[in-house]
Amino acid sequence: TPDYSQGAAFVRGRYVPIGEAAIPITDWGFLRSDATYDVVTVWDGAFFRLDAHLERFLASCARFRLDPGLSPAQITAVLEQCVRLSGLRESYVEMIVTRGQPPWGSRDPRLAVN
């Protein structure tokens, strides 16, 4: 079984140990800093003001025309599962959405798949 004791990540639809989380080198989030993020604190096993963080994160996604690919309820469920898998009671949880990878040779960000 995977070791999530250092943290868990949700990448491309699956949970992985934080040390195995990766994005392709051709992802525009990596190449061009075309991404957005927000960080929420977990204290004593509970998120601190998750609704406010999620609202701000989704507003940033909309402003930069980034599709998180999940509904707010689904994002919440993913974050909760990451904390549950890790067993960490005190932590920071980062929500990140990148532009993704465009088709090879394309410069059109609308064609990128994240």
PLM features: residue spans?
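Conserved alpha/beta cores of soluble small-molecule-handling proteins
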Residues: 1-114
